[in-house]
Amino acid sequence: MEIIRSNFKSNLHKVYQAIEEADFFAIDGEFSGISDGPSVSALTNGFDTPEERYQKLKKHSMDFLLFQFGLCTFKYDYTDSKYITKSFNFYVFPKPFNRSSPDVKFVCQSSSIDFLASQGFDFNKVFRNGIPYLNQEEERQLREQYDEKRSQANGAGALSYVSPNTSKCPVTIPEDQKKFIDQVVEKIEDLLQSEENKNLDLEPCTGFQRKLIYQTLSWKYPKGIHVETLETEKKERYIVISKVDEEERKRREQQKHAKEQEELNDAVGFSRVIHAIANSGKLVIGHNMLLDVMHTVHQFYCPLPADLSEFKEMTTCVFPRLLDTKLMASTQPFKDIINNTSLAELEKRLKETPFNPPKVESAEGFPSYDTASEQLHEAGYDAYITGLCFISMANYLGSFLSPPKIHVSARSKLIEPFFNKLFLMRVMDIPYLNLEGPDLQPKRDHVLHVTFPKEWKTSDLYQLFSAFGNIQISWIDDTSAFVSLSQPEQVKIAVNTSKYAESYRIQTYAEYMGRKQEEKQIKRKWTEDSWKEADSKRLNPQCIPYTLQNHYYRNNSFTAPSTVGKRNLSPSQEEAGLEDGVSGEISDTELEQTDSCAEPLSEGRKKAKKLKRMKKELSPAGSISKNSPATLFEVPDTW
């Protein structure tokens, strides 16, 4: 179902109902770009640490706009043994709500726009009809603006609310405004004495003059009139004064308050959908979903925090349970039978033996997708096939049970090992970002950091290390790269051989990370005062954290072919007998259809700790067959 600004409000109840009924959701996003600086290959270095990858994406990807959000809900029908789906395709755009609303600035990447255009993406639906949204801080500020308006209007009997700023004595009026206010008071006196006229429209005036009018009427006419600010077609603001009794005044105020709440909800817009997903506490599925999660939190909750640990805590509070199908397909028992984990190819592979495609049907009133037509890069369709991939893989896990299970639910313990682990693209030895605890810290004692002239190419590096067999090169920038050797004992030889080189420098990974950490500490020390001020106005989602144990799997190795060239590091006879180089170890609740999330982050943390202690058994998954290894479904701790 396509949702734009004009039909968002009328279909919001359908979205809420789908979220409430669903067993799990699948999501996907389309963006205005990926990287505003480095190329994608530089943005995803093979030896990034999780912290480094987070910082890169935060710095170079968050200024783009998530402007299409796909949501597909899945509910299992036990009677007919099939899934009922409801797909939504939301077009999102930060249209300013009023003159004081945030005027969001974002960037576009030409290659991304060109690609989406080639896929038939309709940009007019984004920019002309996109659904507005506010993050939590913007929503808070807008609510304060409404409260301020009600407070200012309180004195003239316009509101039943009490303002601390209401004047209880004559207002001090500037000399240049006294004549204007006297004329207004004179008109109101005529209105009150007239038996025919009930309303008085004042001429458009400035915000300061309107404030003086409200304050003056607050003191001079505490009862008997209703004061309201309206806007002309030309966006000029003016005041309307009406003669009313107390009952009529209260009725009008209730109408006005209801209208303001409706306007506020309209401004919060699409964020209400994200709040509903978060408040449900249900499993959210995505494919290679780290960027989707970062953009969702950044746009609809609050700017991303400075460090990875706080991002993890924030994310698990917003989305208690996440599952990445790309990670799932990349680990056992799927890794050996799935060669390509891209979404389109994965969906095709999971239709073949030994997998069984799930029986799926669109709910009445919702359009159905035909996977044969491959509507890729429409967010709603991508979310739909992501959900299909999850179902097929989850059901395959059920075949290892004794007795086998055809249907594995989203609450089965079989899929727990994959919870809250997000796939890290192109990282050699850290397959995922662990949202629920410390990230993996593989030994990189076989990795070297090399700096060299910017004229060097990949072939130059292969030539330099030609004497060391198979290597893997991961570029950092134009003048540096990581080089992974096949044998750790070769590291010290390479470092010693390059001591007297003039055009390049080689150091161990441990040395490089140590110096980088020292520089970071020095920088942090110099900016310590500003760091103290950074801990304010953070996320306050109303959520139920969900904590699970970590599960790991076995080690795998990576090699790359070497290229022999003229420039090389051939060890001397003396160096060939050196000792091994020193290794360096581097360091489900009821849906609440609320329009804001008022619970502070600290409360979410308390709930997280409580749930860790009170962790309940999910739906029984059955017993594992004796013939299958105990670690069959565990996510690896090394890659």
UniProtKB/Swiss-Prot annotation:
Divalent metal cations. Mg(2+) is the most probable. CDD domains: R3H_PARN, RRM_PARN. Changing residue 115 to A: Reduced affinity for poly(A). Little effect on activity. The keyword Magnesium applies. GO terms for molecular function: 3'-5'-RNA exonuclease activity; cation binding; metal ion binding; mRNA 3'-UTR binding; nuclease activity; poly(A)-specific ribonuclease activity; protein kinase binding; RNA binding. Changing residue 30 to C: Loss of function in the presence of Mg(2+), Mn(2+), Zn(2+), Co(2+) or Cd(2+). Its cofactor is Mg(2+). Changing residue 113 to A: Loss of dimerization. Loss of activity. The modification Phosphothreonine is found at residue 631. Phosphorylation by MAPKAPK2, preventing GADD45A mRNA degradation after genotoxic stress. Homodimer. Found in a mRNA decay complex with RENT1, RENT2 and RENT3B. Interacts with KHSRP. Interacts with CELF1/CUGBP1. Interacts with ZC3HAV1 in an RNA-independent manner. Interacts with DHX36. It is linked to Dyskeratosis congenita, autosomal recessive, 6: A form of dyskeratosis congenita, a rare multisystem disorder caused by defective telomere maintenance. It is characterized by progressive bone marrow failure, and the clinical triad of reticulated skin hyperpigmentation, nail dystrophy, and mucosal leukoplakia. Common but variable features include premature graying, aplastic anemia, low platelets, osteoporosis, pulmonary fibrosis, and liver fibrosis among others. Early mortality is often associated with bone marrow failure, infections, fatal pulmonary complications, or malignancy. Pulmonary fibrosis, and/or bone marrow failure syndrome, telomere-related, 4: An autosomal dominant disease associated with shortened telomeres. Pulmonary fibrosis is the most common manifestation. Other manifestations include aplastic anemia due to bone marrow failure, hepatic fibrosis, and increased cancer risk, particularly myelodysplastic syndrome and acute myeloid leukemia. Phenotype, age at onset, and severity are determined by telomere length. This is Poly(A)-specific ribonuclease PARN.
